[in-house]
Regions:
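Short loop/edge segments at beta-strand edges and connector loops
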Residues: 6, 25-27, 96-98, 114, ...
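Redox-cofactor binding/interface segments in oxidoreductases and associated redox assembly factors
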Residues: 4-5, 41, 131-132
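Glycine/serine-rich phosphate-binding loop and adjoining beta1-alpha1 elements at the start
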Residues: 1-22, 38
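Rossmann-like dinucleotide-binding cores of NAD(P)H-dependent redox enzymes
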Residues: 30-31, 36-40, 46-121
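Hydrophobic/aromatic ligand-binding patch that stacks against planar heteroaromatic rings
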Residues: 2, 54-55, 129
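Glycine/Thr-rich phosphate-binding loops of Rossmann-like dinucleotide-binding domains
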Residues: 12-14, 49-50, 55, 139-141, ...
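FAD-site-proximal beta/loop scaffold in flavoenzymes
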Residues: 19-37, 123-124, 128-166
Length: 166
């Protein structure tokens, strides 16, 4: 038996690569040298919420943009409701049901253009932007063909219910 444990990388937005200066992955978000005045977070999963909460407690004004219409959809509704209250009380600002249309990086910050849940065009200007929209497997260049491994559409190794490959 062989275990393939190649890890993962943060998923980037299609038109906004991580520069780890203005547009940050969760790794880059831990390396910010000073507290930004304003911070945007795209994605309200566990990592995005953790990063937003940390930087809010340090003094940044934090806005979290989430594509899903609700908060923590995979969690019990009561727990999600209480968590949203707690994060809001900390001072995090949330917008749900957004559709990001453009991210422009400038010398002084990042401009995020999006449609809100009502379909209205909105622009958010922040010093830094954390993109926390999931992870992608590190399987590029793994050379799976000679050993017969299959990758799914996301690049993960295909396994059965017992975590065995083909």
């Amino acid at each position: 038996h062989v275990i393939v444990a190649t890890g993962s990388n943060a998923r980037a937005l299609p038109d906004a690569a991580f520069d780890e200066e203005r547009v940050l992955s969760n790794d880059g978000a831990l390396r910010i040298g000073a507290v930004p005045k304003t911070l945007g977070v795209i994605g309200s999963g566990v990592i995005g919420l953790e990063m937003g909460s940390v930087w809010r407690r340090l003094g940044a004004e934090v806005t979290v943009l989430e594509a899903m219409p609700g908060f923590l959809a995979a969690v019990d509704e009561g727990v999600a409701k209480e968590a949203l209250k707690a994060f809001t009380k900390q001072g995090l600002r949330f917008e749900f049901g957004v559709k990001i249309s453009d991210v422009k990086v400038g010398k002084k910050g990042v401009a995020v253009s999006y449609a809100n849940a009502k379909g209205e065009a909105v622009k958010l200007d922040v010093e830094r932007l954390i993109v926390s929209i999931g992870r992608v497997p590190n399987t590029v260049g793994l050379n799976v063909d000679p050993v017969g491994l299959q990758l799914d559409e996301r690049g993960a190794i295909v396994v059965d219910a017992d975590c065995k490959t083909n």
